[in-house]
Amino acid sequence: RCPRGSPSSRVRLQPPQRRPESQTGRELKRFVEVKERAVQIVTSLDKHKAEDIRVIEVGDLTSLADYFIIASATSSTHVRSLSDYVEEELGRQGIRPLRVEGYSTSNWVLMDYGSVVVHLFQREARAFYDLERLWKDGKQLETADFIEVRGND
């Protein structure tokens, strides 16, 4: 027992409170921002002729990201170009990747945007690493749902 008047004697255990609406609002805002970022990336890749674009929802499987975006390119030059286009288009909005790996070899470029990780492969490297198989428990999403339809760009 705590002596009367001590701080511990005045503390009452409260039942767990329901999360404040502002927390729910923040989570919704974050979800929308992450989805918008994924849409921007997939739209850019599609616009610049990336092949076999896949979006895998991995948030329930890992804390690394919410989405993996995987795409193929026809050559190392195409891989670098796709990486440049994505970085440039998101950069216009002040969004920079946390890191980019593999750019110098351009066999596989990884672009880490926090909640969205982009994997750009040459076809052979994609077949070899087979990330779709490694992350098969993730939810495969319809790529068409991530492509923004715009007017004449």
Question: At which residue positions do the language-model features occur?
Answer:
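Long, contiguous binding/interaction regions
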Residues: C2-D60, T74-S81, E101-G102, N107, ...
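A short, glycine/Asx- and small/polar-enriched loop/turn
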Residues: S63-D66, D112-S115
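Short hydrophobic/aromatic beta-strand micro-patches
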Residues: I70-S72
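Short, residue-level hotspots on alpha-helical faces of the histone-fold
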Residues: Y85-E88, S115
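A common structural junction motif
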Residues: E87-Q93, K139
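Active-site phosphate-binding and catalytic loops of NTP-dependent enzymes
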Residues: R92-V100
